[in-house]
């Protein structure tokens, strides 16, 4: 297994010149053995490998593996240790003790030669590893901060050159201290540390109290407090977040604002904490009130609009020639219908001008009600039929009115008979027909009778289309 397979890319060990000396020394001693020459050629080609070919062939029991990995992968004297192991590899086991089997004198010299190489490699390795740990984990050994950065020029990248190298090490230290303090002091609802300032919202759970970052313990080091707020500004609020598992960003923003005094920041934390749920509680009923009022207005407006349009259509109809049999019934209902119409007219004058294009309809309605005051007989049945037709998917199309043929007297009589039957039998309840009499009714004549005046009068056409659009919306 080659070393570069599992070593990270930033772990660059420059190969020291001592390993080349040991390999030259080994070349002198290995002239007598052909198999060692072959092996050395292989290992020279692959001098990076920590294991060579021994792990599979020479040492089936893996006797020296752990030790050799320590020397071969970690240290700089890789060639020395490898080549010793190749010499003794075929005889299995611990290569240092058995390296004198073949040609004991020469291999003894080789053994002595490579020992100091290994020791120096180990020392370098320890020093580099300590420096690496200190660089990446400054909170583990604070002495590293006072040492000058020696190795920063060797490797490049984010590991060695962070975006802000000056503030990096103290900031990481502050994180460590803050975390230990928080973990020691917080038995989860921490009310004592906040200088007896509980969260103002009484309904909020005690988790909110634990979310305040707790600089309220009187700060012994003002510099640490400043650096902590600086850390919050830079954006490392994840430390507090990971401690509590819940992120409350209002508190971090407020602590970042107040750098110098600690009590102000705690007050602001409490304020921001308590204000958000209170605002939410206040806003929700306000929203529901608005929507409720709007829906009520709209529904009432639509109801009034339906009533007025039904009256209009009936007036058009009765004006077309059906004023014969209505007098007796009209006298009976005239008072109530006039009152309804007055109420509706007042309501519409207040409401309808908010919608677009309906002012003409108001004026027309007023003119009509003054000219034909006694023609509101069939309003209830018409309203029911109209509602049913709309539920079945029929729409008022003012464009198709010109194609309709003029009404005949037979059609008008048929319509009157049906409507009178409906009213006498009392088959209408809540605006819904209970039996299928509406099926015998021909849609064409009713539609034509409704829209006959609109052919003569252009204003009526526009007003009816406007009302139908508003009603469909």
From Swiss-Prot:
Transmembrane segments: none
Biased composition (Basic and acidic residues): 119-133, 293-329
Biological process per Gene Ontology, one example term: DNA-templated transcription
InterPro entries: Vasculin_fam
Pfam entry (one): Vasculin
Annotated stretches, region: Disordered: 1-25, 44-170, 186-341, 450-473
Keywords noted in UniProt: Activator, DNA-binding, Methylation, Nucleus, Phosphoprotein, Transcription, Transcription regulation
First and last residue of the signal peptide: none
Domain of life: Eukaryota
Residues where Omega-N-methylarginine is found: 87
Modification sites for Phosphoserine: 49, 274, 276, 322, 381
Molecular function per GO: DNA binding; DNA-binding transcription factor activity; RNA binding
Example of a GO cellular component annotation carried by this entry: nucleus
Annotated family: Belongs to the vasculin family.
Subunit and interaction comment: Interacts with GTF2B, GTF2F2, RNA polymerase II and TBP.
Function, as annotated: Functions as a GC-rich promoter-specific transactivating transcription factor.
Protein name: Vasculin
Gene giving rise to this polypeptide: Gpbp1
């Amino acid at each position: 297994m080659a070393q570069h397979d599992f070593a990270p890319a930033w772990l660059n060990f420059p190969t020291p010149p001592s390993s080349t000396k040991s390999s030259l020394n080994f070349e002198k001693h290995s002239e007598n053995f052909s198999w060692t020459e072959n092996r050395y050629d292989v290992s020279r080609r692959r001098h990076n490998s920590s294991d060579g070919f021994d792990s599979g062939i020479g040492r089936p029991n893996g006797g020296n593996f752990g030790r050799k990995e320590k020397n071969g992968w970690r240290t700089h004297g890789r060639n020395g240790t490898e080549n010793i192991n190749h010499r003794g590899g075929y005889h299995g086991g611990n290569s240092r003790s058995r390296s004198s089997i073949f040609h004991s004198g020469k291999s003894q010299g080789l053994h002595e030669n490579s020992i100091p190489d290994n020791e120096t490699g180990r020392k370098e390795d320890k020093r580099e590893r300590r420096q690496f740990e200190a660089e990446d984990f400054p909170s583990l050994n604070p002495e590293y901060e006072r040492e000058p950065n020696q190795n920063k020029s060797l490797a490049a990248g984010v590991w060695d050159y962070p975006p802000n190298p000056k503030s990096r090490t103290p900031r990481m230290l502050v994180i460590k201290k803050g975390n230990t303090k928080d973990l020691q002091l917080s038995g989860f609802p921490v009310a004592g540390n906040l200088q007896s300032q509980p969260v103002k919202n009484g309904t909020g759970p005690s988790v909110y109290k634990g979310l305040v970052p707790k600089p309220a313990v009187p700060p012994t080091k003002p510099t640490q407090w400043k650096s902590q707020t600086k850390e919050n500004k830079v954006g490392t609020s994840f430390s507090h977040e990971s401690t509590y598992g819940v992120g409350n960003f209002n508190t971090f923003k407020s602590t970042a604002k107040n750098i110098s005094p600690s009590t102000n920041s705690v007050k602001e934390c409490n304020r921001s904490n308590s204000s958000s749920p209170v605002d939410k509680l206040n806003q929700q009923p306000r929203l529901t009130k608005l929507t409720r009022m709007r829906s009520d207005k709209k529904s009432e407006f639509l109801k009034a609009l339906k009533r007025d349009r039904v009256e209009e259509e009936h007036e058009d109809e009765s004006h077309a020639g059906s004023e014969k049999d209505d007098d007796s019934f009209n006298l009976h209902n005239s008072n109530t219908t006039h009152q309804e119409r007055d109420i509706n007219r007042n309501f519409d004058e207040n409401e309808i001008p908010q919608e677009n294009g309906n002012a003409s309809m108001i004026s027309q309605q007023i003119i009509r009600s003054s000219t034909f005051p006694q023609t509101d007989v069939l309003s209830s049945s018409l309203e029911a039929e109209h509602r049913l037709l709309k539920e079945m998917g029929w729409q008022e199309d003012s464009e198709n009115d010109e194609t309709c043929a003029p009404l005949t007297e037979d059609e008008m009589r048929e319509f009157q008979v049906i409507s009178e039957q409906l009213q006498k039998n009392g088959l209408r309840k809540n605006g819904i027909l209970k039996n299928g009499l509406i099926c015998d009714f021909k849609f064409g004549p009713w539609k034509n009778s409704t829209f006959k005046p609109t052919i003569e009068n252009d204003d009526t056409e526009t007003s009816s289309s406007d009302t139908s659009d508003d009603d469909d919306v």
